């Protein structure tokens, strides 16, 4: 998680109205990918990190600095991208204060048998 926080910190002020978020993907105790919210807030960190993995995320763990979004806005929900990637666990450090996502991702991911912890 510390690496994800460092990624987010380095991108502060460059993500428009979106928060700067860091994401790290770990499989078999090794970092296989990472991402950060892109310039002007899109794509989100989870999408950036998962795209780099090229479908190698089955049974992996995601560490992300903010609860993954679960609503349709200017991008599809990160929860959808996470579900399609077949990750096993998602850890996030802060719940999203946006009421469209607040605490929803835990419910959505858990319903798909993806363990979530904040």
Feature locations, PLM:
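Short, basic/aromatic recognition patches
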Residues: 1-16
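Helix-turn-helix
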Residues: 22
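Zn2+-dependent cytidine deaminase-like catalytic core
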Residues: 25-118
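A generic fold-level signal
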Residues: 16-18, 44
